[in-house]
Each structure stands twice: as C-alpha cells, then as structure tokens.
UniProtKB/Swiss-Prot annotation:
CDD domains: AdoMet_MTases. The keyword Hydrolase does not apply. Catalyzes the formation of 5-methyl-uridine at position 1939 (m5U1939) in 23S rRNA. It comes from the Bacteria. Belongs to the class I-like SAM-binding methyltransferase superfamily. RNA M5U methyltransferase family. RlmD subfamily. InterPro entries: 23S_rRNA_MeTrfase_RlmD (IPR001566), MeTrfase_TrmA_CS (IPR030391), NA-bd_OB-fold (IPR012340), SAM-dependent_MTases_sf (IPR029063), TRAM_dom (IPR002792), U5_MeTrfase_fam (IPR010280). Residues 23-87 form the TRAM domain. Residues 1-23 are annotated as: Disordered. It catalyses: uridine(1939) in 23S rRNA + S-adenosyl-L-methionine = 5-methyluridine(1939) in 23S rRNA + S-adenosyl-L-homocysteine + H(+). This is 23S rRNA (uracil(1939)-C(5))-methyltransferase RlmD.
Length: 472
C-alpha cells in the first residue's frame, strides 16, 4: 500500500499566539449574581442598575448559578460582556473540586467544578428550555436521565499535536481555554486510563519522527480490544519513522493508521492482524469500524442508549422500521433482532457499506436493507416512495433532521401517504431537536410523549438527548 500523499503540499508551520495579559486583581472589580448557565456552561448574570431595571448581560466562565462573584471583562459589546471570574464571593452548594489538575487551563472540559448530578440537571434544563422557547412544547413525560461512568469514558478523541520550543517542546492533547495553544497536559481524566498514561510517551515518540513539526493531529479510537491512533501525515514518512511507529505499537499495544490526505486515504499501518470493534452484548452484536468512522465516544452510555431507544420504539415482530442517519448500523442491527424488517438510510457511502457488511457479519442481512441518500434534501415524495414503515428511528448530526420533519409534515397536511405511528429521535443538539419537534407536533400531528438527556459527554456542556413522538 502507498503511504505517500496523493499530492504534495507546502508544510504548514504553526505559529503560536502571544499569551493574553493576566488580569491584575485590584479589589475594585465589579460584582454580579449568577442566575443560570448558558449552552457553553458559562455563568449568566446581569449588571445591577440604580433604578432596578435589567442591566447588561454578563457571561462569566467558571462560575455556577447562585454564586456571587467578582469578574474581569475581556470582551465588551453594547448588549453583553464576556468575562472571567476573579473571585467567588459566595459559593454554590453544587460546586466541587475538579479532579483534573489541568482543568483551569485545558479546554477539553468545562464543567468539572459542578457536581455530576447537577451537571445532568443543568443539561435537562437546557433541553426543556429549548423545547419550550423554540417549539412551545413541554414533553408529557421527562425521561430518567441516561448517565454512567464520568471518568475514563472518552473512547474517541482528536488530539492536537504541536512542536512549541518556546513552551517546552512537544505537546499533545486538547487546546487551552480561549487559546490556540495546546494545554500542557501530562494526563487526562476523561480518556481511558491506558490512553492517559500514553500522553507523555506519545510526545517522545512524535519528537523522533521526521515530520514532528508538521503533524497536526492524532485521531484516537478505542475499541473493545484494540486502541487505534491515526497519524495525520501531510508528508510521506521515512523508513526510520515506520520503525519508530512499530516499536511504539509493540510496546504500548496500539495500532497505527496513516492518513496522508482526506478521510478516504486512511489505511492501517501496523499491526495488521487486529480489528477495531465495539459490542452491544444485549443484542449479540459486534460492530467493526474504522477509526475515522462515526461512532459514539462513550461505549457504556451507547449501550444504554440503544437499549432505551429500542424500548421506547417497541417494535413488534411484524413491524417495518426505518432508521434514518443509520451510520454503521448502531441502531439498525439491534432493531433487526426484534422486528420484521429494518431499512437503514445514511448519507455517507463509506458508512453505508460498513453497515451492510456489519449486517452480514451479525447474521441479520435477511432482515435489513441499506441505502445511501442525502437526508438533508429528502422530500415527501421520497418518503412515500419508500413505502409504509410502522416506526422511525432518527439519529441525525448536529444539523438535525429538518428535511425529514418537513416531509412528514407535508404528508400529514396532504393526507397522501403513510406516516409512522411512533418516532424515536436521538439528538446531539437541543436547538435542532426543538426545531424539528415543533414541525412534528404542530404540523405533522404528533405528540411529544417524552424527552430526556443522555450524558454522553460528562464534564462538558454537550447535551445529547432522546425524545419519543406518537401519532394517534
């Protein structure tokens, strides 16, 4: 196999920005009461005015609702300011000591200072606020949150790589808060322990490569028995580089892949006799994947999520189910175990092919079919042409499933075409879920039976959720 880039490009030299000036505490900083958290886990408050009218909105990082803090503004606009906390004058009972040594500088996590149960409650509030404000909806039932291990859960990550001689040499990890620098992190509490322990050895290994200062990132994917690292090699690697990778792989029990170009250029390098996969034991499913395929970052939560989604969808043995944005078959294959027929539709040809292969591997090819289609442009006629499906499962990216929701609304208005009686919608962006839910309820005639959060990314502001819609 070729390990050279299909075309040469000029090496990218990474420049480091000047450090932001540190705030000098004077004791005269303004003080504010924190009311809530926004979508980025920043505290939200308003300045106090003499006549009691609402003042300017202030977004303060590192604070919690109920706290009274002094702050320093680093960006001011006519209607709001962005600020950093100087001192917490009154602490929230929800405040906890961050486990990670690097929490104050690393941008990988934003909520370690908030108790994990309170994190889930905050995310549930974000979900409900989006549904109410954007779609004028309240779920009939608030589902019990899905949560699990909050440390060592991150089985996928993109680790930035930079050579910074003025900052001490090689760095590998996440970016600093509000900076393009990479945090000087020697361990990471949200990565699996064996990966966290590799961060420093990885620095030394990359420094030995000929492309050490022209390598932008390492892509991490952890499977059930294999840990893969994708080297983004914008230039060909040398024979000496290859030996460095082999030696590291043997010592640390990892598999290296190379990516000289776009995602389609990713190929395994060494060793070649192992395979990435994850399992769904409840359904007897083994799911092989490539390290650049989309899979959920949190394997434990994904297993619970699949189980919850299938229980809510409750397919009968006679049901035909449509799985939209099916990926490599994360929901499709378990559904095939308990329903008559499942059709998976995915926008990526690569993922569609992987789903088809996984169906064959798991013995459910006779109950599944797959199609590659752009679901961001799907129409009512497209859905009609697919025929009748009793139930839908929708698991879109952050952009949501607007075209699907519009198509269902058009079918409902026209009365021409079948509609599923039940829809389970798995979302990774509450704003687009709310938008699509508004169409499904107000225009397509569905009820929002329930919704709840899925804490897929503990200690971050990311809100994943699941919702159930039914049509009488």
């Amino acid at each position: 196999m070729s390990r050279t880039a299909p075309h040469r490009r000029a090496p990218k030299r990474y420049k480091t920005p000047p450090p932001a000036p540190a705030h000098v505490v004077t004791g005269n900083e303004p003080v504010i009461e924190i009311i809530s958290l926004d979508m980025e886990a920043r505290g939200v408050g308003r300045t106090e005015t003499e006549d009691g009218t609402p003042g300017k909105v202030i977004f303060v990082e590192g604070v919690l609702p109920g706290e009274r803090v002094s702050y320093s503004t680093h960006r001011s606009k006519p209607k709001f300011e962005q600020a950093e906390v100087v001192q917490v004058l009154r602490e929230s009972v929800m405040r906890t000591k961050p486990k990670c040594t690097y929490f104050d500088i690393c941008g990988g996590c934003s909520m370690q200072h908030l108790d994990i149960r309170a994190q889930v409650a905050v995310k549930q509030r974000v979900l409900e606020d989006n549904l109410q404000h954007l779609a004028k909806l309240r779920p009939e039932t608030v589902f019990r949150p899905i949560h699990g291990p909050s440390w060592g859960y991150r089985y996928r990550a993109r680790l930035a790589v930079r050579f910074l001689p003025e900052k001490g040499g090689m760095r590998i990890g996440f970016h600093e808060k509000k900076s393009s620098y990479i945090a000087d992190m020697k361990t990471c509490e949200v990565l699996p322990p064996h990966v966290s322990a590799m961060l420093m050895p990885l620095r030394f290994m990359v420094r030995k490569l000929s492309i050490y200062d022209r390598m932008p990132q390492l892509e991490l994917a952890v499977g059930s028995s294999v840990t893969a690292l994708v080297v983004r090699n914008l230039e060909p690697i040398t024979a000496a580089d290859e030996q460095v990778l082999r030696d590291f792989a043997d010592e640390h029990k990892v598999q290296f892949w190379l990516q000289p170009g776009g995602p389609d250029t990713v190929t395994p390098f060494y060793p070649l006799d192992v395979q990435l996969d994850y399992t769904l034991p409840e359904y007897g499913i083994r799911m092989p994947f490539k390290p650049t395929d989309f899979t959920q970052v949190n394997h434990a939560i994904n297993r619970v999520l699949v189980s919850r989604a299938l229980r809510l969808l409750a397919p009968a043995r006679t049901d035909r189910v449509l799985d939209l944005f099916c990926g490599i078959g994360n929901f499709t294959l378990p559904l095939a175990r308990i329903s008559k027929e499942v059709m998976g539709i995915e926008g990526s040809e690569v993922l569609t092919s992987r789903a088809l292969a996984n169906a064959g591997l798991n013995g459910v090819a006779g109950h599944t079919s797959f199609e590659c289609r752009n679901l961001f442009e799907v129409t009512a006629d497209d859905l009609r042409a697919l025929g009748h499906f009793d139930k839908f499962l929708i698991d879109p990216p952050r952009e949501g499933a607007l075209a699907v929701a519009k198509a269902l609304a058009e079918i409902a208005r026209s009365g021409n075409g079948p509609l599923p009686k039940r829809i389970v919608y798995v979302s990774c962006a509450p704003a687009t879920l709310a938008r699509d839910a508004g169409l499904l309820v107000h225009e397509a005639g569905y009820r929002l039976v329930g919704a709840g959060v899925v804490n897929m990314f503990p200690h971050t502001s990311h809100v994943e959720s699941i919702a159930l819609f039914e049509r009488d």
